[in-house]
Amino acid sequence: IVESQSMAGGNSVRATGGMNAGKTAYQDENTFGEEAGVEKTLKSAADSYADNAAVTELAQTVTAQWQAYQANPEGYFDSVELMELDTMIGGKAVNDVELVKALCANSAEAIDWLTTIGANLTSVGSFGGASVKRIHRPVDADGKTISVGTYIVPVLEKACQDRGVEFLFD
């Protein structure tokens, strides 16, 4: 790994939010109360992006998922497609659709993988652009949410070192 600075992480070490991931086990530990967020996203898709085939198709899928959830509200409502829809709307529907699909489809697996190397992003909360609680953040020993960058970069650096990955600094 080539780092332009004398330490690992670059701008990532400054990240304070968390990592967005859809349909994770950590989300299921929360009580769902974001009905208004889902409705707002579906309305935005219909009102502002009716001429965009990708957004319209996602909105149709999410509408069916949302109706099924409302008929049988078990667990926390989220889906890969809702995350895709939020991402497309956040990008004003000019996103690379295939890249959005890849990002969203692999997001829960990424959270699971991070857990295997000791990067536990167990706190799930709301953040701008997401219709539901989807941002995964680390917590300290007291259960207080902490900055993701200063937490995750050392964990990732150690995982790389444990696997013999060479770092080149400066």
Question: What kind of feature is each model-predicted range?
Answer:
Residues 20-103:
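Glycine-rich active-site loop/strand segments that organize a redox cofactor
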